[in-house]
Structures are given as C-alpha cells and as structure tokens.
Amino acid sequence: MVSKKEENILSETRRFNEIDLWQNVTEEQWNDAGWQLKNAIRSVEQLKKVIKLSPNQASEIERTLKTLKSEGKEALRITPYYATLMQEDPFHPVMLPGEKAEKRLDPVFWQSVPTPANLLFPDTGAEGAMSEGSRSYGAAYQRYPNRIALFVAENTSCASYCVHCQRAKSLDGSVDVNSTEIDRGLFYIGHNSNINEVLVTGGDALMISRHRLQYILEELGRIPHLRVIRIATRVPVVMPMGITDELLGLIRTSANRFSKGVEKHVYFMTHINHYKEVTNDLAAAVKRISDHGFTVRNQTVLLNHVNDNYKTLAETFRRMFWIGVHPYYLLQCHKEKGIVHFITPIQIGKIYMKHLQGWLSGITVPRYAANIEGGGGKVLLMPSGHDTLNINTKIDEKISESYATVITWDGRELVSYEALGRSTREEFEAGVKIMDDFIGRKGAFLPKLIIVDEKGKHIETTNRTRLPALENLRKSQLLGYKLYADDMPLTNPKDALSELEEGFEKSKYFKG
C-alpha cells in the first residue's frame, strides 16, 4: 500500500471539464497536443473563464497586453493544461505551511499572466540584455570553448509563454529562424573541432516540425567530434501530452542514424520553477522520456514572488528529483526590462543554498549561478562551508551590499556587478501602489530594487530589512522531518535504540 506521504508528492491539476472554458471538451481532445496548441489562452476574455478576476484586474491585464503588443511583444499564450495548474483564485492561493500564503499570489499565475508589474521600472533593465547576436554564426551562438547553442526555433514558438523569459517575445519577422541560418550554424559546429556538446534550443526545440527536428539531429549525428546533444524544452512542464513515444523514437533514431562508434549522448533540459508544476502528467512524461533511454535535467530560475522561499525551493527540488528530474541549476533572474520585479538578491539565494546543504540529498541541491550579460557565461554563486578569508562573517547574519566583483570562466573581472534593478524612490512607491491596487491588498508585491538619487547614487535596497531565519528547528519543521532529541531529525540510530528494538520485535522482520 502506498503511504499518504507518497501520494501527496504530486500536485493536482484542476479538473478541466469543471472549468467554464472547457466544459464540453472530451478526454481525447484534452490529451491531444494539437488541440492544446490550437486552444491556448490568448485573451483576457478566455482567462476570465479559467480564473477569478475582478473588473479592475481584468482591465489592468488587458492594458498591459495592449501596451506590450504596441512594443512588438506577444505576451500571452498559456496551454489549457498549464492553465489548470493555476488556482481558481490566484490572488488568494492555498499554499503549504511555512510559505506565507498571505504574501503570495499563485506561482503559475505569476509565471504565465502579464501584469502591470511588467510595465514598471522601465529604466532598470536593458531590452535584450542577454542578446545572442554578437556571438553568433547563423543560428549558432557560442561563449564557451567546447559547447554551443543552436537556435532552431523562434522565441514565439513556445507552447506557453513565460512572463519572466529573458528573451522578449517579438511579433516582427526578424526573429525567424530559417533553414539557411540553421545550416550555417550546423556548418560552424562541424568546422570547430573543439565543440563536443550542442544545446538545441529556441524558443522550444520540440515545437519545430518533425521534419526539421529530424534533419537537425541527423546532421549533428554526422559530426564526429560532437559527443553530446542537449535538447532544451518546456513541453514536459506546460504540455506533457506533447511528449509522445513517436517523438522520442524519432529523436533516438535521428541523433545516431549516421554517427559512428560510441553513440551520441542525448539528454533533455527542462524548466520547472515550482512544485505546483510537478504533477502526475509531468511524471508520466518524464517516465516516457526515461523509458527511451534519455535523462532529464532542470534549470530553475530563482524568482521573487514565485519561489523565493526556503520551503518552496526545497519542495520543488526534491519533488522533481523524486519523479526522475535532476535539479541541475538554480539561476539568478536576468536584469531584463520588464521583469526586474522577479529578481531576488544573490545573498538570499546563497542563504537558501547554504541551508539546503545536508538537509536534502546532495543530488537534489542544484548549483546556484548567474548568467552574466555580454557573453560572460555562468558564474557560480554557491556558498562555502570552508571559511579562510572572512573569519566570523556569516552570510546569513548581516545584509550585504547589492553589488560584487565577479570573475568569469575565462578570467575576466567585472567590478561592481549588480544583480538588482534600479529605481528612484518616487518610481518605486508609485509602482508598488499600482500593484497593491491591482492585487487588492498590500504586502504581496515586494520588489527588491536599488533606490538611487537623481545622480544615480545608491541610497538603499528595498524590502531588505531582514534575512531568512533558518535555525535547525525551523528547517526541520519546514521540511516535515520527525523530531527527536535536541529538536533535530534522527541522524544516528543509536539515539533511538530502545524505541527501535521495541519496534523491531513487533515487526515482520523479527524472527524470534
């Protein structure tokens, strides 16, 4: 018999035929990826039939969408499946104990639905801060010696759009990824013998035609020095019915049809940000992937308002691992225009990582890193338990500055690197009021921004009056561990010897 705890590791979706928009939809239609794409939520009118929105909330979302569209951005697309992960009232979510639900909105809502927050603080992040163009040849983009990204799909190809995406969803034709660009990228990968790993990405690598996917994988398979093919996709998370045996068979066959010797190692990289996304449907999709011999790794983005919480991160990492997804990276949110309200101070991320170490299985604790603008690549932000330089200075005891010196993988030193966005006090206070009015209460919109004066000089960082308090008892409670002596989980059987002996003698294992 499955225990109650095991039954509860997967989040439940809402029943689609109990939602106004899909009352007459059949199971067959619902489980068809083509139907999901055709019926994606693209308007506020559709959204109102799925979640509760006040007239003001609906109006403000509509205003946001129109403004973004006028800037050339296609901002709203949610698959029906992913929409069922949103609670009916996203402004008053039910959450786990310790997650401070009164200060939160539904995490899938935050990730999927543009709000007035996306129009605030326009001068705090650059448009296209993570642009690939300056380091590209055709569809290939490189910033490391041995690996490369091959962009095979437009930004607008994704099944569902992520509000926090580092790449703006453009409506103009300049984002087209045509066959010539792909061929130029394939040529470069074959030309540069240092490259042994390629990231096939987009947009979403699994949202292109089967014909194009087969062609790309077969051509990559012909390159002798290429050893690893990584496929970047969020389809398992936002549209798991799109992960079919037919698709997986095509990937396995195509990647090695023309390879010689040892087969190319193919694996998937996906994007889970919250345990609410770890559902039975996702678990089934991951099992199909693993049954075809592929592994799945994950990159989570640390997002203020979504998963900026010790309990939330712990549940997200361990639940995804329990269904077969390896938590690979926890990434700092990019300082991109329109999404700076999602940024969490790096110090907070380091504190979470410090206190996850040892309390979760090592393989479930990802590497914390920031992707540096301008082709700097990833810089690790992991805290260390080995202190030789900062004697008696602990990361979780004093609020640090909001900037630091970072050193990239190739030895470049960036002085005063800032992870947070900037704002004047007037702009910040006006923005908070707009969002308080939109949400309907205070305290749920807490952007972390650097407040500057008229000369750009740092005054303070907002919403940083305290650091997470994570003593052992608190961590034990948040992680749901049974407590023994000293308010700690049992880590030595000898500490509970009498209880164990008594229980063993009553168990089926006792032979007398």
Q: Which ranges hold each PLM region?
A:
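Conserved, mostly hydrophobic/aromatic
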Residues: Y82, C162, Y328
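C-terminal accessory regions of radical SAM enzymes
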Residues: M353-E499, F504-E505, Y509-K511
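Short, solvent-exposed amphipathic alpha-helical segments in soluble enzyme
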Residues: R167, A285-R288, D387
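Conserved Radical SAM active-site core
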Residues: V113, F121-F151, V163-E263
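Cysteine-centered iron-sulfur cluster-binding motifs in ferredoxin-type domains/subunits
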Residues: A153-Y161
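Conserved aromatic-histidine-acidic binding/catalytic patches
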Residues: K66, S70, E74, D204-A205, ...
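Conserved AdoMet/S-adenosylmethionine-binding subsite of the radical SAM
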Residues: D183, Y188, L206-L360
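Flexible, acidic/Gly-rich N-terminal and inter-domain linker regions that tether
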Residues: M1-Q142
